[in-house]
């Protein structure tokens, strides 16, 4: 059996690696000959995927921000088409990554109409889409959906799609891989009297430009107002390190840089995280660390979103979306200033009542994400679906 898995960006590589590992384990237990090939990043390759192209750094949010990736994405898609013409697959598994994945799925739907397509982790068009067009595009190419959020499952079930809610795979990652606060601080050589602030600015290149300066400015202010502040910054992709180091130098900040694989350690050790909006917000919440969440896109992208698409979401972070209330502060676009970030951070660090409420909200969030064993359930559903489709075509 050959399964093609397609995703992109840092978060897709992480989610994909967890699925690849679970698929390989189940195939071994079932004595099933399984070949996994596709698009992703180093984590997926390390887990056992034959990588056709590395797409971990190819991703953006916004119209103008995506322009630089048009040619690389097109080239990768042509490579995928050539591969699939000579290497038939039994199942296509898509993970998030809406634009590129829909292009591949539409090609396969037209060229091989009987090929089954499973979406694992649907793009969050169900949250942010201003029209029904994006939902219709996903529905048109999806035979089965494995949802990680309850709201995601409910939304697509109402649209008539075959959906199974498996829970969020980060539950498994945190359970198996995350260190305790004490062991994380010991590993990093942090004294008990130090206040640790972990900075998580970017999984996309555009975020270094739009978010890192404000984050550094906020860190500067917090260091000037609090004693014994230690700053940590895990670098999600090695290619980002030169730009990060240059920005830190401009702000005269002393920050302990860590490899991306140390992200959970950097979070677990923290008293506060200052972070971009994204999947990492759930990791922070599952490790019970207060966080200030921010996001920015180019002014042109935001102007188009507001005026043409009437962009007006109550929340953008998954921590707030899951519970449908603002359990953590979000600072978006013009609000994402250094002073606003620092002020929100001080409130989270110094207000004991707020910290107690955060702990309660985080527990509710954890319960809403399902039970551990997510990756095993997802892998089982993928293999059962693939086997069922093979038998129906036989």
UniProtKB/Swiss-Prot annotation:
GO biological process, one term: lipid A biosynthetic process
Pathway annotation from the record: Bacterial outer membrane biogenesis; LPS lipid A biosynthesis
Catalytic activity: a lipid X + a UDP-2-N,3-O-bis[(3R)-3-hydroxyacyl]-alpha-D-glucosamine = a lipid A disaccharide + UDP + H(+)
Pfam family, one: LpxB
Cellular component GO terms, alphabetical: membrane
Keywords attached to this entry: Glycosyltransferase, Lipid A biosynthesis, Lipid biosynthesis, Lipid metabolism, Transferase
Principal EC category: transferase
Domain of life: Bacteria
Enzyme Commission identifier(s): 2.4.1.182
GO molecular function, one term: lipid-A-disaccharide synthase activity
HAMAP family registered for this protein in UniProt: LpxB (MF_00392)
Function: Condensation of UDP-2,3-diacylglucosamine and 2,3-diacylglucosamine-1-phosphate to form lipid A disaccharide, a precursor of lipid A, a phosphorylated glycolipid that anchors the lipopolysaccharide to the outer membrane of the cell.
NCBIfam families according to UniProt: lpxB
Entry similarity comment: Belongs to the LpxB family.
Record's protein name: Lipid-A-disaccharide synthase
Taxonomic lineage of the native organism: Bacteria, Bacillati, Cyanobacteriota, Cyanophyceae, Synechococcales
């Amino acid at each position: 059996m050959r399964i093609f898995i397609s995703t992109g960006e840092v978060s897709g590589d992480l989610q994909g690696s967890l699925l690849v590992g679970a698929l390989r384990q189940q195939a071994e237990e079932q004595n099933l000959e399984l070949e996994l090939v596709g698009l992703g990043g180093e984590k997926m390759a390390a887990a056992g995927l034959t990588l056709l192209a590395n797409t971990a750094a190819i991703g953006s949010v916004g119209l103008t921000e995506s322009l630089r990736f048009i040619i690389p994405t097109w080239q990768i898609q042509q490579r995928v088409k050539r591969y699939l013409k000579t290497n038939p697959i039994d199942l296509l598994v898509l993970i998030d990554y809406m634009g590129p994945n829909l292009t591949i799925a539409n090609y396969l739907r037209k060229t091989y109409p009987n090929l089954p397509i499973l979406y694992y982790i649907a793009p969050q068009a169900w949250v942010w889409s201003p029209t029904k067009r994006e939902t219709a595009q996903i529905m048109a190419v999806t035979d089965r959906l494995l949802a990680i959020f309850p709201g995601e499952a409910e939304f697509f079930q109402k649209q008539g799609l075959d959906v199974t809610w498996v829970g969020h795979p980060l539950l498994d990652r945190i359970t198996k891989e995350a260190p305790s606060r004490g062991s994380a601080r010991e590993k990093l050589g942090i004294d008990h009297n130090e206040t640790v602030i972990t900075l998580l600015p970017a999984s996309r290149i555009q975020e270094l430009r739009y978010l890192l300066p404000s984050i550094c400015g906020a860190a500067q202010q917090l260091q000037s107002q609090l004693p014994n502040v230690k700053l940590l910054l895990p670098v999600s992709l090695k290619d980002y390190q030169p730009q990060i180091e240059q920005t830190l130098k401009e702000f005269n900040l002393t920050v302990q840089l860590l490899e991306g694989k140390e992200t959970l350690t950097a979070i677990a050790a923290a008293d506060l995280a200052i972070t971009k909006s994204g999947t990492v917000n759930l990791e922070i919440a599952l490790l019970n660390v207060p966080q200030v969440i921010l996001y920015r896109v180019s002014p042109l992208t935001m102007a188009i979103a507001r005026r043409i698409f009437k962009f007006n979401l109550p929340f953008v972070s998954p921590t707030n979306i899951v519970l449908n209330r603002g359990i953590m502060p979000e600072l978006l676009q013009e609000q994402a200033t250094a002073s606003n970030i620092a002020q929100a951070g001080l409130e989270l660090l110094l207000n004991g009542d707020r910290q107690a409420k955060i702990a309660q909200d985080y527990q509710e969030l954890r319960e809403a994400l399902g039970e551990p064993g997510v990756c095993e359930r997802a892998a089982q559903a993928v293999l059962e679906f693939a086997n069922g489709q093979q038998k129906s075509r036989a």
